Regions:
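N-terminal Rossmann-like dinucleotide/flavin-binding domain of flavoprotein oxidoreductases
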Residues: 1-34, 113-139, 144
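Glycine-/small-residue-rich beta->alpha transition segments that form the dinucleotide
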Residues: 30, 35-37, 41-47, 67, ...
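Conserved N-terminal Rossmann-fold NAD(P)-binding element of oxidoreductases
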Residues: 40, 80-81
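Glycine/Thr-rich phosphate-binding loops of Rossmann-like dinucleotide-binding domains
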Residues: 48-50, 87-88, 93, 172-175
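FAD-site-proximal beta/loop scaffold in flavoenzymes
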Residues: 57-73, 162-202
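Rossmann-like dinucleotide-binding cores of NAD(P)H-dependent redox enzymes
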Residues: 68-69, 74-78, 84-154
Length: 202
């Protein structure tokens, strides 16, 4: 469909080099392209916080991307984060028979939802066997063990064949060359106005 509409797709890592007399200069896959207008669509990626032990845990730690590529169903799964994505996977793996434990920093799951709805859903999930540890802050990962502190200051832990990091997402802006155009960022994301325009014309 793209080709039929005279749209060329170039696969590779694109980087903005700056402005020239030919327009905005972009390099990708060994080629240089020029544009009058530039649309940034770099998307977002799962945020993995720098919790001690994360790197050492290796492929025990997964995000919403890697968990879909698993070759074997985990017998147990610890999910760090009780937001929408975390609860989707909690429900899915619970229905397959995986033992699921959710560790959430807030006092409720699905933080953006109405409190009554959140409580109702938590009750439904709990009756299906999902374990919840709310008001808990993760302090360390020890292999397949998630160490956390509860609201009373007690240190506890939960083990899983896999640990799903589901604490949010962040904009992909590293390496795109935004600094070469002077694009302003806001907490790592490209800053835009109410019409999705950046501080740089075009």
């Amino acid at each position: 469909a793209m080709k039929a509409n005279k749209v060329r797709v170039v696969r590779g890592e694109a980087k903005v080099k700056g402005r020239s007399q030919n327009g905005i200069e972009i390099e990708c896959a060994g080629e240089t392209f020029y544009a009058v207008n530039l649309l940034l669509c770099t998307g977002s990626e799962a945020f993995v916080p720098p919790i001690p032990g994360v790197k050492e845990a290796g492929d025990i730690i997964v995000t919403n991307r890697e968990i879909l590529d698993l070759k074997e169903q985990p017998k147990s799964l610890v999910i760090i984060g009780g937001g929408v994505i975390g609860m989707e996977f909690a429900s899915f793996f619970n229905s397959l028979g995986t033992e699921v434990t959710v560790v959430e920093m807030l006092p409720k799951i699905l933080g953006g939802l109405d409190g009554e709805i959140s409580a109702m859903l938590q009750d439904i999930y709990a009756k299906k066997g999902i374990k919840f540890n709310l008001n808990c802050k993760v302090t360390e990962i020890r292999g397949n063990e998630v160490v956390y502190v509860d609201k009373d200051g007690q240190t506890l832990s939960a083990k899983g064949d896999k640990i799903l990091m589901s604490v949010g997402r962040r904009a992909v802006t590293a390496g795109i060359g935004h600094e070469n155009l002077g694009l302003e960022l806001n907490r790592g994301a490209v800053k835009v106005d109410d019409k999705m325009r950046t501080n740089v014309p075009n």
